[in-house]
């Protein structure tokens, strides 16, 4: 089941969630490349971003990037979003990376500008205030893997193929890959993977720690999505403010020395002390019941 965002937070008509009324007659008939679904019922709080550019295997083109940036800008203001899950509506592919056909038509200046914009997109994903999960049910190459690396958690089908393959195309990772991969795997291994342009399957990626979980693919081709959804369901019952602050403490702490990181943790902890959710958690423990967190 899906819910519709409050009017102030709705996406443009062509991005309305499934089940919403048809857009006004002036709306474009073009299928949006980014679709947003907010789940309801027991999954309320989980919002999905579906990448849907089948003719280009979800390649990162201008329209794709623009729609994704706009979706993120609106969703980050929606307090009902507790987990953001990235998945593909195209079977067999997560995101094939840069749209090289589109890029061939750009001047050198335009290429530089677009890559800078792409880098900004990945930074927006990384800075999203709630946990983000990439469900990788197929190819995640180049910029596609950089998108997944910008997420907090990654789930892959064992048969999924991923890699920063830019050096095989005369390029280098330009949307955060040279920075996030070594932070994920360590410098030496990241260099090896980038220098060689090596591709990994989901099982290999799990062995290296590149993904959190690898699962056998199913006939529908969405096994990683189902595992990612199960992980999101584990996050949902937890105190949302504490989860957000935990993400801030980890992300900012990883950028500094441990003493500074401890100071960041202290500041985050101090922000959580006066919350209703902390008091509810203490009361629930004392009364031996499940807590009911409200995000306040």
From Swiss-Prot:
The modification N6-acetyllysine is found at residue 101. This is Enoyl-CoA hydratase domain-containing protein 2, mitochondrial. Belongs to the enoyl-CoA hydratase/isomerase family. It holds the Pfam family ECH_1. Keywords: Acetylation, Fatty acid metabolism, Lipid metabolism, Lyase, Mitochondrion, Transit peptide. The lineage of its organism: Eukaryota, Metazoa, Chordata, Craniata, Vertebrata. CDD domains: crotonase-like. Its main location: mitochondrion. One of its GO terms (cellular component) is mitochondrion.
């Amino acid at each position: 089941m899906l819910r519709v965002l409050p009017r102030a937070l709705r996406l443009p008509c062509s991005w309305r969630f499934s089940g919403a009324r048809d857009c006004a007659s002036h709306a474009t008939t073009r299928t949006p490349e980014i679709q947003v679904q907010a789940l309801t019922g027991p999954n309320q709080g989980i919002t999905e971003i579906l990448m849907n550019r089948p003719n280009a295997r979800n390649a990162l083109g201008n329209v794709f990037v623009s729609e994704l940036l706009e979706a993120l800008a609106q969703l980050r203001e929606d307090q009902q979003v507790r987990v953001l899950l990235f998945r593909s509506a195209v079977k067999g592919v997560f995101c094939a990376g840069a749209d090289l056909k589109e890029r061939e038509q750009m001047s050198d200046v335009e290429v530089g500008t677009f890559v800078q914009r792409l880098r900004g997109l990945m930074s927006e994903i990384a800075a999203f205030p709630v946990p983000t999960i990439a469900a990788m049910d197929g190819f995640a190459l180049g910029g596609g893997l950089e998108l997944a690396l910008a997420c907090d958690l990654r789930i892959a089908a064992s048969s999924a193929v991923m890699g920063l393959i830019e050096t095989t195309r005369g390029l280098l990772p330009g949307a955060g890959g040279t920075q996030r991969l070594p932070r994920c795997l360590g410098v030496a291994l990241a260099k090896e993977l980038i220098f060689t342009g090596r591709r990994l399957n989901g099982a290999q990626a799990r062995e290296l720690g590149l993904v959190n979980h690898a699962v056998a693919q199913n006939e529908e081709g969405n096994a990683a999505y189902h595992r990612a959804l199960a992980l999101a369901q584990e996050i949902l019952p937890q105190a949302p403010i504490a989860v957000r602050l935990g993400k801030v403490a980890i992300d900012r702490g990883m950028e500094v020395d441990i003493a500074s990181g401890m100071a960041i943790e202290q500041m985050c902890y101090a922000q959580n002390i006066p919350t209703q959710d902390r008091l509810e958690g203490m009361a629930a423990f004392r009364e031996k019941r499940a807590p009911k967190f409200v995000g306040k």
